[in-house]
Amino acid sequence: RLSLVGSEMCIRDSLQKGDEIIISTLEHHSNIVPWQMICEITGARLVVTPINQKGEIVMGEFVKRLNSKTKLIAISHVSNTLGTINPIYEMVELARKYNCKILIDAAQSAPHFELDVQKIDCDFLVFSGHKTLAPTGIGVLYVKYDLFEEMIPFIGGGDMIKEAVSYTHLRAHETET
C-alpha cells in the first residue's frame, strides 16, 4: 500500500530531485524501504526525524525538518516496537502549514483505536489486513477524495474504464472532450 502511493507519486512527477520525504526513526521497514526506493528513482531526499529516550518523536526536531521542499510526511500512528503513540493530529496540522501530503501508517493502531480519517485529516492512511485478522497479503489504502480524483492509475481495467477502443480509452470519471 505504501508502494502504491509512492509509485503513483513518481508517475505523476509530484516528487522530483530536491524534494523531501519525512519519516521517523520509529518506522517499520515497510514505511522506510518504499521511500528509500522512491528517493533513489526521483532524486528526492529522505529526511529522518529523531526520537527521545522515551521513544517519542521530538516535535521540535520534526518542526525543524519541515520546509517548502517537504512533499510528504509518512509516519506511523503507533510504533510497532515501542508502542509509542505519535501525535498525528499535531503533525497533520503542521504539515498543512507547508502544503505537504501526510500518510499515516495505521498498521498498529487500526486494530485498537477508532480511526476517523476526516478528523485526522490525513491524505493517506494505510494498514495491513492481517493486523485486523484479515487474510495475509491484503490491506487498506485510504486516499482523500480530492487526491484520489487526481491520481493516475498505474494498473488499469475493469469498472474504472467507461469505454475502450483499440488506441484509446475513457476512464469512468472522465468526460469526453
Predicted features, each with a name:
Residues 12, 29, 55, 79, ...:
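Catalytic cores of nucleotide-enabled group-transfer and carboxylate-activating enzymes in metabolic
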Residues 104-106, 110, 116-134, 139-143, ...:
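Conserved active-site segment immediately N-terminal to the catalytic lysine
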Residues 45, 51-111:
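Active-site phosphate-binding strand-loop segment of PLP-dependent enzymes
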Residues 1-6, 11, 169-172, 176-177:
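Single conserved hydrophobic/aromatic residue that forms the stacking wall/gate
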Residues 133-137, 142-171:
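Active-site C-terminal subdomain of aminotransferase-like
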Residues 12-32:
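Conserved PLP-anchoring active-site segment centered on the Schiff-base-forming lysine
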